Regions:
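Hinge/beta->alpha junction and helix N-cap segments in small-molecule ligand-binding domains
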Residues: 9-57, 70-78, 96-98, 110-119, ...
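Flexible loop/turn connectors
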Residues: 57-150
Length: 150
């Protein structure tokens, strides 16, 4: 919605979830003819609030005109929001699965954690049964999600 200097703060780069969300971020920038700036892309080795805070600090030293931040996790988002509040910066933050209702996120993707956990467990049980019966089956499940704008 009018932002052009959008940062990405993700979890460990080796995780598929981080890579998938990074790919989505890069594709969105490309679709809107926005530059990809590696100085606005960060990867935490752990999903911790302090990592989001510290990356925000680095980000605004490099680019004080950053006008939106996407995080891959609500803990990282919490650190980002704390930094923004502390420095009285009005920058929208978008994240995945907002577990803290007090976070002032512009929007988040509700990944339906309950259904994700239940489906994962059921799939693991099915795989165990298939292995016992010498069956090899490829599983793919899509869990419904929702974008929640505040």
């Amino acid at each position: 919605k009018g932002c052009s200097r959008i940062a990405f703060i993700g979890g460990p780069k080796k995780l598929f979830v981080t890579q998938d969300r990074l790919t989505g971020y890069e594709q969105a920038l490309q679709e809107h003819n926005l530059p990809l700036d590696s100085q606005r892309t960060f990867f935490a080795d752990e999903f911790l609030e302090e990592k989001g805070y510290n990356f925000s600090k680095q980000l605004f030293k490099h680019d004080p005109q950053t006008d939106a931040i996407i995080t891959t996790d609500s803990l990282l988002a919490e650190g980002v929001c704390n930094y923004l509040n502390e420095h009285q910066l009005d920058v929208p933050v978008l994240s995945f699965d907002s577990v803290n209702p007090k976070l002032n996120l512009a929007a988040y993707v509700d990944i339906n954690s309950l259904a994700l956990g239940r489906t994962s467990f059921e799939t693991i049980l099915q795989i165990i049964n298939d292995v016992k019966e010498n069956r090899q089956i490829c599983y793919r499940q899509v869990i419904a999600h929702e974008i929640v704008e505040k």
